[in-house]
Structure formats: structure tokens, C-alpha cells
């Protein structure tokens, strides 16, 4: 399910359903957990979130379509994300969205060496749809990701480009602290609380003794994400 990202809690401005130009600026690996699908047996599922900042909305006038710049009322870009199972199996949603984003299928060799961090700074088009939340309120979600007109480009972003690598973050608690693990801590502390909870309750973090690790304040500013799962049984759409 896609979700809007805000810098804090409370109210936020929402995108409306439509077609948007966007740039990937953040990737977050929230780890593995046991989950069941439609009452089936539980299985391990590793989740990753892709974040995009939105720059333009597709508009129409007298049958002519054009792109209009869009920002929130304070001038910041809208931000939206989508949750994926970290699998490149051909039936996995991540694989399908990446293929649509690229505009062509992957070769077997490309799948073996795909680095998800290469998505940072890459342009795309997003199809955003509306849906009704469980509490009855209206929300929006990323339905599809497409190759933009003119092809995918690597561009600068307004938000910092960053990737949260859980494997690196975990090393901070296993006596392997270094500049990269400190950088993961910085990213972690800026994540929303619900996402921190996902990370803290992951199988990876539950296997680490974090009780003796005490941080009095956010660390000063000082790898790549874990390999994507090649799970042949991964075919759960979301």
C-alpha cells in the first residue's frame, strides 16, 4: 500500500489521484517478519519501501495534456511511497514495477546483479489512485510506476537521497560500529515512528542484543541494501 510521507505527525497535504512525474529519493529496508496471506501458512517476508518526491502533475485542457509543476503550500515537494516484498521473482510486484519503470524486461544476468540503490535519483511517472481506509477516510496509493517520456534520467532531488540498509544498521549493535553504521543511525532517527517499529520488530533486529546500547542524543553526521530475495514462491500482489 502506498502512503504519504510527512516530516512530522498530524495533518498533512495529500496528493489527489492522477498521473505524476516523480524522482526516487529514499529506500528503506525494514527487515523480515513472518506473515500469512489470506489465511495461508506464515512465511518469511522482507519488506522494502521506495519513496518518491513528486514534481509535476498531468493536466488536460481542451483535449491537450501537459505537465504542471506541483508543490505543497509551503513550497516543499509532495512525497509518496510504496511498500514492496523484497523479491525479484517475475510475479513479485517489485519486479513488475521495475520492469514497467525501465520500459523493458530484465535479463537473467541483470537480475543477479541488480542493486536497488541505483534507483535513487531516477525519474519515473506514477499512477496514483484513491482508496478508502479502514477508518472510512480517504487515502491515496501508488498503483503503477512507468518509464517517463524521454526515458529514465538521473537527476538531483530536493530531499536528500538516502538508503537505509538494515544489515549496516545492525552492525552498530554488534561491535562493528563505523562511519557507515553511524550514517544508518542518522537515517533511522529521521524515520516516522511506525517505520522504526517495523525495523525494531524485524527478525533481524530481534536477533541482536540492543538492550546494552544507549544513545543519549542523535549521532552526529559522520553499503548497499541487502540482496533482494530470489524467492520463487513470492507472488503476493500489494
Where are these regions (language model features)?
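Short beta-rich binding modules
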Residues: 1-238
Amino acid at each position: 500500500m502506498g502512503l504519504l510521507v510527512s516530516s512530522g505527525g498530524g495533518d498533512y497535504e495529500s496528493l489527489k489521484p492522477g498521473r505524476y512525474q516523480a524522482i526516487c529519493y529514499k529506500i528503506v529496508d525494514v527487515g523480515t517478519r513472518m506473515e500469512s496471506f489470506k489465511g495461508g501458512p506464515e512465511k518469511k517476508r522482507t519488506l522494502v519501501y521506495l519513496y518518491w518526491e513528486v514534481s509535476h502533475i498531468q493536466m488536460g485542457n481542451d483535449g491537450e495534456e501537459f505537465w504542471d509543476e506541483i508543490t505543497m503550500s509551503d513550497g516543499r515537494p509532495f512525497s509518496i511511497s510504496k511498500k514492496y516484498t523484497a523479491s525479484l521473482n517475475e510475479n513479485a510486484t517489485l519486479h513488475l514495477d521495475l520492469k514497467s519503470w525501465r520500459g523493458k524486461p530484465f535479463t537473467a544476468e541483470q537480475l543477479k546483479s541488480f542493486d536497488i540503490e541505483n534507483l535513487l535519483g531516477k525519474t519515473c511517472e506514477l499512477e496514483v489512485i484513491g482508496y478508502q481506509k479502514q477508518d472510512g477516510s480517504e487515502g491515496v496509493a501508488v498503483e503503477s510506476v512507468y518509464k517517463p517520456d524521454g526515458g529514465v534520467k538521473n537527476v538531483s532531488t530536493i530531499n536528500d537521497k538516502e538508503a537505509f540498509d538494515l544489515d549496516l544498521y545492525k552492525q552498530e549493535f554488534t561491535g562493528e560500529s563505523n562511519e557507515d553504521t553511524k550514517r544508518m543511525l542518522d537515517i533511522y532517527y529521521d524515520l516516522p515512528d511506525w517505520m522504526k517499529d517495523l525495523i525494531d520488530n524485524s527478525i533481524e533486529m530481534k536477533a541482536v542484543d540492543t538492550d546494552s546500547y544507549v544513545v543519549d542524543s542523535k549521532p552526529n553526521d559522520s553499503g548497499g541494501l541487502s540482496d533482494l530475495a530470489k524467492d520463487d514462491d513470492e507472488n503476493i500482489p500489494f
